């Protein structure tokens, strides 16, 4: 007898989730009519690629997941054992210099990326504004033409009162 709402969890082999994610992504991208045949062709191409390049996406994905879930970089580190104060100072100053350089490099790269993104956003907005102006000009000109046609059809002309 099975329990319909059981609290059991099945263990999925490492890397299998990544393979299924890749297949799902390609199915959504390609929208094939025959999904099982497409999946078979997709897995065959992955096997060929793995044989040619010695790169296994399932293995790579399992390593990435393992690194993500087993990363101990953010745990508290034990204080280093006491040694010569001069050595500690040189080690600390060297680390500070390295981190400051990498922070500057990354911030410069980030600034460049932000500038490129800002230019793209500004260009898109300017294009949007220009399209709206053109649309407004078209509707204004159509309305003016309709008014002129209506005034000609009725025979009435608009008078301006002169003083």
UniProtKB/Swiss-Prot annotation:
The keyword Membrane applies. Keywords: Membrane. Testis- and sperm-specific. GO terms for cellular component: membrane. GO terms for molecular function: calmodulin binding. It is found in: Membrane. SUPFAM superfamilies: Dimerization-anchoring domain of cAMP-dependent PK regulatory subunit (SSF47391). PROSITE patterns: IQ (PS50096). Homodimer. May interact with ROPN1. Sperm surface zona pellucida binding protein. Helps to bind spermatozoa to the zona pellucida with high affinity. Might function in binding zona pellucida and carbohydrates. This is Sperm surface protein Sp17. It comes from Papio hamadryas (Hamadryas baboon).
């Amino acid at each position: 007898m099975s329990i319909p709402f059981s609290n059991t969890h099945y263990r999925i082999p490492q890397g299998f989730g990544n393979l299924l994610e890749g297949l799902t992504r390609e199915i959504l991208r390609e929208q094939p009519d025959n999904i099982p045949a497409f999946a078979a062709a997709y897995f065959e191409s992955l096997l060929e690629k793995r044989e040619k390049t010695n790169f296994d996406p399932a293995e790579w994905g399992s390593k990435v997941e393992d690194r993500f879930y087993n990363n101990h970089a953010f745990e508290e580190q034990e204080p280093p054992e006491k040694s010569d104060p001069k050595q500690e100072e040189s080690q600390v100053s060297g680390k500070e210099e390295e981190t400051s350089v990498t922070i500057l490099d990354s911030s410069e790269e980030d600034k460049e990326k932000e500038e490129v993104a800002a230019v793209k956003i500004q260009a898109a907005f300017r294009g949007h504004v220009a399209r709206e102006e053109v649309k407004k000009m078209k509707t204004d000109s159509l309305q003016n033409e309709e008014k002129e046609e209506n005034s000609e059809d009725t025979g009435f002309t608009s008078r301006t009162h002169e003083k």
